[in-house]
Amino acid sequence: MKRLKKWVLPYYPYQGYQLPLYWYPSSDPNCLGHDLNILDYGVQHITNILQKRYCSLFSVFTICFPRVFPVDTTQDNTYFCNAMELFLRGIAFTHPSYIWVRERNDSIHQHYHLALWVDGSVCKSFIAIGEALECRWCNTLGVYTPGLVEYRSAEYNKIELYRDRSDLETIGQAVYKYSYLSKLYTKETDINTNVKHWHHNR
């Protein structure tokens, strides 16, 4: 019987947290570790949210293009930015804050990860919000393909952050989850893109 190749995921120490290093076996040092600009901003935002809001709901969404989409988006975030503008306008009552990152695996099109915080006193679930995001995304693309926005996993993995009540373990879970956005190995380091690869609203 052929033995499976086995390797251990290393960890990255960051401000007392043990975060996954998120790497594929590679000789390219640019594919290892985290973008500290993205990581630092998000972790500071989690701290700010805990100070400013009694309860905040947090999770991460993945937004993809259809497998067959006949437009070259290598140098373009227009579709995503237009969809986000409409989406955020529709959920303004939840007082959203967000950070998005642009990434690419083996697809000809990029995908996006969206870290979203909403007011937990007016929103208890990400299902309706995820459905709204998928609707805006599909309308912007001019296609309807269910599953382009992974919102059910966002609902399943949501984290509730409470001011003065969230323990270090809960905060650590939020930092761990957010750190996925800062991984380097899918940040298009091998493609000459001149477009913004991450953005936040505050």
Residue spans of the language-model regions?
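Generic alpha-helix detector with strongest preference for long hydrophobic helices that associate
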Residues: S27, F65, H95-P96, H111, ...
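Signature for HUH/AEP ssDNA processing cores
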Residues: H45-R104
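Eukaryotic short linear interaction motifs
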Residues: F69-V71, S107, V122-K124
